[in-house]
Design a protein with these regions (language model features):
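N-terminal Lys/Arg-rich, disordered targeting/topogenic segments
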Residues: 1-5
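Solvent-exposed coil/turn segments that connect beta secondary-structure elements
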Residues: 78, 85-87, 97-100, 147-149
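An anionic, turn-rich surface loop/hairpin at beta-sheet edges
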Residues: 104-132
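Hydrophobic membrane-insertion alpha-helices, especially the h-region
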Residues: 6-26
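Beta-strand signatures of extracellular beta-sandwich domains
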Residues: 93-95
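Transition segment at domain starts
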Residues: 27-76, 106-112
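Short, exposed beta-strand-loop hairpins at the edges of beta-sheets
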Residues: 131-157
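Short, surface-exposed binding/anchoring microloops in extracellular/periplasmic proteins
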Residues: 70-91
Length: 159
């Protein structure tokens, strides 16, 4: 083997290793740094006073093997609780929308009509406080969105 081929092979294999490590780090870092998920009892206490209920499903148009959520969503006057699982990822946000959204294109096109409720920091169950300025009754859909990569994760219609 000549020296050029060896050098190209070395650079190629090391590049793949570095790229794979970087991708694995992006995937694992949110999992490793996530706070403890709220207990099911805490989520269910919100469910008991919820005004609305929805369901995150895996079968939405832009949900895929890396971007999905499934479980029950409970919308109360002061908090939104989720009992279920989300695909792990960085910088998830919970939005409320006046219309059902299930694609990235629709999210971007309608973002001006939505309100960001807060950060989603756990991937099994979550609780998000509803700011006083937000009235969930004025919306119909909750959406989990990855702000860092502009990725649709999941959505639930609740009224």
């Amino acid at each position: 083997m000549n020296k050029l081929v060896k050098t190209l092979l070395l650079v190629g294999t090391h590049g793949v290793a570095v790229g794979g490590g970087f991708a694995l780090g992006i995937y694992l870092l949110p999992i490793l740094t996530a706070p403890e998920s709220p207990a099911v009892e805490v989520v269910r206490s919100t469910a008991d006073v919820a005004q609305y209920k929805g369901e995150f499903r895996r079968d939405l148009a832009d949900s895929d093997a890396l971007h999905w959520g499934e479980g029950d969503l409970f919308i109360g006057p002061n908090s939104i609780a989720f009992e279920g699982r989300l695909a792990p990822g960085p910088d998830y946000r919970l939005y409320l929308s006046p219309k059902f959204i299930e694609t990235e294109a629709d999210f971007e096109a309608n973002k001006s009509e939505m309100v960001q409720v807060g950060h989603v920091r756990t991937f099994e169950n979550f609780m998000v406080a509803v700011p006083e300025s937000v009235d969930p009754a004025k919306f119909t859909t909750a959406i989990v969105w990855c702000e860092a990569f502009g990725q649709f994760i999941t959505a639930a219609s609740y009224q």
